[in-house]
């Protein structure tokens, strides 16, 4: 039998509250034990009016706010010999030492500010940032700016076009090290490792992974954009990637390419003089 179906034995000293008598709309309230009500630093108003007596405070602190104890019924807690012996000043200390089982229901009290949310007028989607809304609005454009050179299908984003073109070229840069199966996207590889091989990724939540720079002509992958530029410049001089590369990077790479050539030329001249 799987361990998830096994029932653990509960410790005898833990008092569990029964939620069957409460309505559904009040089961998510925070449970504050009656015995700990008088230990609050700021007692409710009815406790102050009673002169700070422990009986008045305990009766009003059974539920949050002190006013719901009369409207909602509360399950009687079992009496233990420890509570009978702990009367007077030691009663609260004994109650604090007794473990209390609290509800595992998670709830939030915050509300979203509608002024911060940016809504799409066409489909009703909401976004936190204006730039995300602007990127989303591109999918509603009837005119597709980026066309596939193989089949003519249009896309509004260059990333979507690159992902589609790989289905024609067969380039799959993300390869599984276990079964050598390759994928066009990193997310597909991560999903394959988790579902098929049970390999969990070791990076933290929202942590940026090492980016791969892929040559769309032959499938070469490099750790930096400079490595990709050097590869395309040497093996694919007529590639469109060189035209789309920024002028600053192109000038930088040209300097790196010419410097070794100049050094080789100077060395050859010195050897000829000798």
Curated annotation (Swiss-Prot):
Subcellular location: Nucleus
Zinc finger (C2H2-type): 118-140, 146-168, 174-197, 213-236
Compositional bias ranges of the Basic residues kind: 1-11
Effects seen without this gene: Mutant embryos are small and die at 9.5 dpc-10.5 dpc with an open neural tube, impaired extra-embryonic and embryonic vascularization, abnormal cardiogenesis and placental defects. Reduced number of primordial germ cells in 8.0 dpc embryos.
GO MF assignments: chromatin binding; DNA binding; DNA-binding transcription activator activity, RNA polymerase II-specific; DNA-binding transcription factor activity; DNA-binding transcription repressor activity, RNA polymerase II-specific; sequence-specific double-stranded DNA binding; zinc ion binding
Resulting phenotype, residue 120 to Y: Causes obesity in mice. Obesity develops with normal food intake and reduced energy expenditure. Mice are cold intolerant with defective brown/beige adipose tissues. Reduces interaction with CEBPA
GO CC annotation, single: nucleus
Expression (tissue specificity): Expressed highly in testis, specifically in spermatocytes. Expressed also in skin and at lower levels in the ovary. Expressed in adipose tissues. Expression is lower than in testis and a relatively higher expression level is detected in the stromal vascular fraction (SVF) than in fat cells themselves.
Keywords assigned: Developmental protein, DNA-binding, Metal-binding, Nucleus, Phosphoprotein, Repeat, Transcription, Transcription regulation, Zinc, Zinc-finger
Induction: Down-regulated during embryonic stem cell neural differentiation and up-regulated by BMP4.
UniProt-listed Gene3D superfamilies: Classic Zinc Finger (3.30.160.60)
GO biological process: angiogenesis; cell population proliferation; dorsal/ventral pattern formation; embryonic digestive tract morphogenesis; endocardium formation; epidermal cell differentiation; epidermis development; heart development
Regions of compositional bias (Basic and acidic residues) in chain numbering: 18-29
Residue segments, region Disordered: 1-88
Modified residues (Phosphoserine): 268
Principal location class: nucleus
Family: Belongs to the krueppel C2H2-type zinc-finger protein family.
Function: Zinc-finger transcription repressor factor. Plays a critical role in maintaining the identity of epithelial lineages by suppressing epithelial-to mesenchymal transition (EMT) mainly through the repression of ZEB1, an EMT inducer. Positively regulates neuronal differentiation. Suppresses cell cycling and terminal differentiation of keratinocytes by directly repressing MYC and NOTCH1. Important for the correct development of primordial germ cells in embryos. Plays dual functions in thermogenesis and adipogenesis to maintain energy balance.
Assembly: Interacts (via zinc-finger domains) with CEBPA (via bZIP domain); the interaction inhibits the transcription factor activity of CEBPA and is required to repress adipogenesis.
Protein name: Transcription factor Ovo-like 2
């Amino acid at each position: 039998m799987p361990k998830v179906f096994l029932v653990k034995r509960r410790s005898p000293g833990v008092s569990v509250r029964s939620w069957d008598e409460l309505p559904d709309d009040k089961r998510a309230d925070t449970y504050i034990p009656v015995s700990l009500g008088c230990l609050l630093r700021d007692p409710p108003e009815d406790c102050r009016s009673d002169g700070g007596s422990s009986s008045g405070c305990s009766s009003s602190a059974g539920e949050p706010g002190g006013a719901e104890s009369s409207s909602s019924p509360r399950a009687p807690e079992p009496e233990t010999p420890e509570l009978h012996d702990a009367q007077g000043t030691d009663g609260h200390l004994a109650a604090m030492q007794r473990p209390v089982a609290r509800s595992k229901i998670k709830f939030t009290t915050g509300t979203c500010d509608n002024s911060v949310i940016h809504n799409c007028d066409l489909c009703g989607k909401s976004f936190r940032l204006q730039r995300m809304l602007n990127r989303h609005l591109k999918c509603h454009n009837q005119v597709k700016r980026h066309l596939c050179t193989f089949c003519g299908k249009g896309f509004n984003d260059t990333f979507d076009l690159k992902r589609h073109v790989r289905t024609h070229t067969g380039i799959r840069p993300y390869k599984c090290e276990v079964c050598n199966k390759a994928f066009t996207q990193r997310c597909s590889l991560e999903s394959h490792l988790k579902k098929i091989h049970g390999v969990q990724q070791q990076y933290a939540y929202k942590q940026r992974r090492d980016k791969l720079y892929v040559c769309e002509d032959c499938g070469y992958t490099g750790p930096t954009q400079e490595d990709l530029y050097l590869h395309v410049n040497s093996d694919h001089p007529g590639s469109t990637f060189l035209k789309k590369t920024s002028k600053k990077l192109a000038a930088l790479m040209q300097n790196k390419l010419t410097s070794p050539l100049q050094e080789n030329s100077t060395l050859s001249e010195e050897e000829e003089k000798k």
